[in-house]
């Protein structure tokens, strides 16, 4: 898991466009389209994942929330720069977006990690194994650290880091989607 995140980090740290100063709106549009596709498939999955009484099992409820959190984070994170960007006042137009992304990223571990602990205590240890928890915690913490460094420490926009955060949301959303499809609570 760590190796995969390291490779992704190096890909975003070393590409030819790493020193670019302009927003890559095509990359943001692509990330938004992928997020929208994942959310669309998630909506179908949500409709098919209901149990007989019309609700969700506790693990499915958790994964649906995680799907929506990460998918909507990537979607709105990729759409908002189109609305906010103002070339004449670049720093001022990005700062609210960076602070908003930091708050949104901070919400993830604060909300989802206690729920995972509660689900594991409720008898769902086989559905939430430690490697999956470590994978999700790594993504949560990486997103929080990177967004905090952009919003609070650096104070300016680093487009490749911003795209990296959105990509982490998509990786986490894809992971939750795949696990929801292939690993059910009753199995």
Where do the model's predicted regions map?
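N-terminal secretory/membrane targeting signals
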Residues: 1-18
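Hydrophobic alpha-helical transmembrane segments in multi-pass integral membrane proteins
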Residues: 15, 75-82, 137-154
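Hydrophobic transmembrane alpha-helical segments in integral membrane proteins
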Residues: 19-39
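Juxtamembrane helix-loop boundaries in multi-pass membrane proteins
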Residues: 29-33, 56-75, 123-140
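N-terminal signal-anchor/start-transfer transmembrane helix
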Residues: 33-52
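Generic alpha-helical transmembrane segments
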Residues: 35-41, 69-77, 95-113
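Membrane-proximal helix-loop-helix units in multi-pass membrane proteins
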Residues: 83-146
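Terminal transmembrane helical module of multi-pass membrane proteins
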Residues: 141-187
